[in-house]
From Swiss-Prot:
This is Large ribosomal subunit protein bL32. One of its GO terms (molecular function) is structural constituent of ribosome. It comes from Caldicellulosiruptor bescii (strain ATCC BAA-1888 / DSM 6725 / KCTC 15123 / Z-1320). Belongs to the bacterial ribosomal protein bL32 family. It holds the Pfam family Ribosomal_L32p. Signal peptide: none annotated. Keywords: Ribonucleoprotein, Ribosomal protein. GO terms for cellular component: large ribosomal subunit. One of its GO terms (biological process) is translation.
């Protein structure tokens, strides 16, 4: 595999990493309890997924 001829400077590294951004998670509203949740996952608040009780919340 090819190897770099010279080491990247700190400035070049920081400029390169300046474009690394975190993405905001996509949230949807739970149809049962109307809390925000991640899509395609069980609601952590009420335990429902696709209108079925999947997890018992005690």
């Amino acid at each position: 595999m090819a190897q770099p001829k010279r080491r990247w400077s700190k400035q070049r590294t920081h400029k390169h990493r300046a474009n690394w951004k975190l993405e905001i998670p996509n949230l949807t509203e739970c149809p049962q309890c109307h809390e925000m949740k991640l899509p395609h996952r069980v609601c952590p608040n009420c335990g429902y997924y696709r209108n079925r009780k999947v997890v018992n919340q005690d």
